[in-house]
């Protein structure tokens, strides 16, 4: 007898979840401005209307800023893999995970992962007193407090001396909003080529027992203080250009090589070195103090004209390389294999390092987000924040020549609207994140790549266009990054720009200077009129990346938008405090949802 037809028939009703949120922001910050829980069967219609003003600008600055709103869906199972069993209460009869070879995970706690308010306040206070800073030198505790407030953890408060308290210190708070925010930032706002994934910020699969309390005590240890965690506010990356689009290596992993020989056993007979000469490389391992029969003095081999010049008595390992062409040759098949391996490595590095993107890169198949354990991007809106002029010609501006002096200040205004839809098939959270990014300008200390050309091979040659990436010299971005550079010798015809002659910032497509340009600010805008523009300056680079002069690579912070970039155009410099926010935003989320719930919640 089948019970297939026995199903619950839930009521389905429409609900208005619209709300307005007024908030302040800085450029670069990724801020949650809307969040709602989802249940299976939900159908959402998102409408967005946003209006932004800026704090007073020092001038009618030639700075361009874009605003972004993005909606995401984060399934709970990506944050805590036991959620499906938890919500259906089937862990006893249908366990899904094993704890060991002989034990199933048959018990799941009675509540979802949580944090204790008093523990969070303790963490914030300890972080503040320890002076912990983020990658831009801002107080991490204040930024964590801001994130908690924007997510809706309203019971936390901060004093003027940056001391934090919780309204009900013993209350247990759901951790899913924090984890979902970090999951979105890891999936969509991380430069995957330069920054490794950090699942510890969003995943709590380790909570598989009776308790689901997230113990944040380890975050206070010395070893963990400098690591990012679930309380950290994140920053978006710059839009990609010549420098922010660089890759850390010309391919994924090491360069592919063709092996021209193999290891062989070595034997000694009456003091003479002998080996199987069927390959081009012979390896040996000799104890120089060996008393083996037939080997009177190994030093003769190690120090002789045909040896390695070994001078001590320790064990040695080395190679005798045969120069016979017969032994050093390789097959065309080996060349094909090396080329295929190199191609695979270069294609792998060109995209994100998750399953979805890698399969699309190599197989040309679009894989659903679920196969890469990614949260889902629903949609979003983009707007432009324009800075216009405000001219003051009142009598207080009369100068000594009895002429009216007009002061030109500025104000920024932006607006946008749009609509998106989404149908939910599992439990999770819908979250909208806001961020604003200036379009990058560089100070005139940036050197055009053309200036580094010397050899004929530095100029574009179509035959060499597809041989791989080229390095971008650090000197092109900042003259302080390389002060002791030898004068290039072009007598040999060796290319300088398209090789690693210069210390490298990273790698870009070959002949990249023919394929893109960067925006530059020069003249008085870099000196007396600096408040009219907000370029990436020498001081900005040097404060963050002085280590590059020692040959080190860029850090992930280089690719993130620093709120301090606009300090020149605003009267107040950016710091960790919300009081220095310079974007004033009013956002109306027109949200309609159809859900498997009754409108009144009554049985009649």
Regions found by a protein language model. Give the residues of each.
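Intrinsically disordered, low-complexity segments
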Residues: 1-604
């Amino acid at each position: 007898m089948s019970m297939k037809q026995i199903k619950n028939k839930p009521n389905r009703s429409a609900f208005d979840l619209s709300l307005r949120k007024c908030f302040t922001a800085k450029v670069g910050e990724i801020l949650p401005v809307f969040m709602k829980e989802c249940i299976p069967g939900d159908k959402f219609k998102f409408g967005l209307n946003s209006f932004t003003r800026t704090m007073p600008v020092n001038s009618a600055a030639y700075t361009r800023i874009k605003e972004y709103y993005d909606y995401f869906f984060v399934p709970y199972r990506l944050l805590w893999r036991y959620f499906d069993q938890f919500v259906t209460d089937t862990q006893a009869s249908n366990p899904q995970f094993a704890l060991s070879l002989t034990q199933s995970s048959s018990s799941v706690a009675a509540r979802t992962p949580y944090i204790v308010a008093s523990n969070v306040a303790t963490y914030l206070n300890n972080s503040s007193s320890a002076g912990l800073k983020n990658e831009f030198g801002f107080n991490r505790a204040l930024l964590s407090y801001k994130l908690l407030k924007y997510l809706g953890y309203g019971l936390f408060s901060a004093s003027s001396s940056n001391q934090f308290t919780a309204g009900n210190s013993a209350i247990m708070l759901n951790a899913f909003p924090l984890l979902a925010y970090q999951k979105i930032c890891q999936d969509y706002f991380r430069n995957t080529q330069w920054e490794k994934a950090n699942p510890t910020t969003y995943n709590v699969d380790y909570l598989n027992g009776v308790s689901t309390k997230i113990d944040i005590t380890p975050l206070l240890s010395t070893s963990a203080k400098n690591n990012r965690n679930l309380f950290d506010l994140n920053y978006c990356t710059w839009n990609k250009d010549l420098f922010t689009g660089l890759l850390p290596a010309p391919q994924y992993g090491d360069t592919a090589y063709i092996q021209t020989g193999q290891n062989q056993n070595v034997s000694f007979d009456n003091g003479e070195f002998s080996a199987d000469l069927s390959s081009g490389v012979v390896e040996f391992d000799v104890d120089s103090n060996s008393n083996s029969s037939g080997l009177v003095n190994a030093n003769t081999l190690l120090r002789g004209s045909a040896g390695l010049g070994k001078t001590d008595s320790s064990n040695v390992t080395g190679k005798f390389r045969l120069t016979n062409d017969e032994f050093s040759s390789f097959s065309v098949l080996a060349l094909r294999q090396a080329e295929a391996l190199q191609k695979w490595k270069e294609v792998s590095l060109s995209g994100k390092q998750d399953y979805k993107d890698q399969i699309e890169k190599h197989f040309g198949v679009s894989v659903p987000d679920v196969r890469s354990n990614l949260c889902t991007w629903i949609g979003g809106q983009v707007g432009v924040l324009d800075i216009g002029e405000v001219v003051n010609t009142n009598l207080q501006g009369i100068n000594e020549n009895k002429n009216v002096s007009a002061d030109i200040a500025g104000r920024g205004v932006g607006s946008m609207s749009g609509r998106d839809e989404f149908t939910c098939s599992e439990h999770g959270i819908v979250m909208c994140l806001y961020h604003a990014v200036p379009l990058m300008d560089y100070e005139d200390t940036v050197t055009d790549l053309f200036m580094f050309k010397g050899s004929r091979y530095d100029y574009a040659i179509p035959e060499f266009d597809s041989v791989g990436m080229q390095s971008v010299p650090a000197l092109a971005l900042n003259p302080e990054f390389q002060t002791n550079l030898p004068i290039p010798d072009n007598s040999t015809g060796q290319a300088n720009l398209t090789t690693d002659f210069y210390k490298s910032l990273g790698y870009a497509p070959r002949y990249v200077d023919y394929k893109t340009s960067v925006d530059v600010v020069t003249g008085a805008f870099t000196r007396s009129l600096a408040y009219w523009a907000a370029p990436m300056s020498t001081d900005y680079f040097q404060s963050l990346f002085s280590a590059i002069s020692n040959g080190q690579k860029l850090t992930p912070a280089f690719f993130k938008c620093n709120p301090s970039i606009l300090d020149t155009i605003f009267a107040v410099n950016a710091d960790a405090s919300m009081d220095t926010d310079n974007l004033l935003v009013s956002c109306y989320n027109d949200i309609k949802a159809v859900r498997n719930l009754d409108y009144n919640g009554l049985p009649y």
